């Protein structure tokens, strides 16, 4: 396993990759499991609760996630070729952040509940209901696979301020 560099919005080349649409993978094999292991290690190191493959420069429909609270046993989850098959009309607002937009947090409104289908780490087909933080996180990460960042859900002014804040923080570091 290896920690990979997380692409960020303050770097033009990184942003160009982050805005691309990822592709489905044909099968879950050892190479893909290696990528998922690297992604999980990278996410834990950051630290974060979710990471899409595009955030480490891989344009494949893969997400890793761990919603365990501090002090709880780690509970890593893997989502290959995830799809939302149903979304509630009821909305839920949550203050989101993103490892590709460091130190920026803002409220985003999304469907409160979704049904998802995906392949797991072993390549088995899974269908599952998601609500609350799980629903927010899976939708946030699936947006990445479509080239959409959480700041794209904000007004142009807030989005521009967010990118400026990240650039300013990088210069100060």
Curated annotation (Swiss-Prot):
Q: Keywords for this entry?
A: Hydrolase, Iron, Metal-binding, Protein biosynthesis
Record field: catalytic activity: N-terminal N-formyl-L-methionyl-[peptide] + H2O = N-terminal L-methionyl-[peptide] + formate
Please verify whether the record's keywords include DNA repair. no
The residues that the entry says bind Fe cation are 98, 140, 144
Q: What is its EC number?
A: 3.5.1.88
Example GO molecular function: peptide deformylase activity
Read off the HAMAP family from this record: Pep_deformylase
- Which NCBIfam families does the protein's record reference? pept_deformyl, PRK00150.1-3
User: What is the name attached to this protein's record?
Assistant: Peptide deformylase
- Species assigned in the record: Caulobacter sp. (strain K31)
């Amino acid at each position: 396993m290896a920690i990979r560099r997380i692409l960020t919005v303050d770097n033009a080349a990184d942003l160009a990759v982050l805005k691309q649409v990822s592709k489905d993978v044909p099968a879950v094999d050892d190479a893909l499991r290696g990528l998922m292991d690297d992604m999980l290690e990278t996410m834990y190191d950051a630290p974060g609760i979710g990471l899409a493959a595009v955030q480490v420069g891989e344009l494949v429909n893969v997400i890793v996630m761990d919603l365990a609270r501090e002090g709880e046993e780690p509970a890593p989850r893997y989502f290959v070729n995830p799809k939302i098959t149903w979304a509630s009309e009821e909305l839920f607002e949550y203050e989101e952040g993103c490892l590709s937009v460091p130190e920026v947090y803002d409220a985003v409104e999304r469907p409160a509940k979704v049904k998802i289908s995906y392949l797991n780490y072993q390549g088995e087909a899974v269908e599952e209901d998601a609500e609350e933080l799980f629903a927010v996180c899976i939708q946030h990460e699936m947006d990445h696979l479509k080239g959409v960042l959480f700041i794209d859900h904000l007004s142009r002014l807030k989005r521009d301020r967010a990118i400026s804040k990240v650039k300013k923080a990088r210069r100060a570091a």
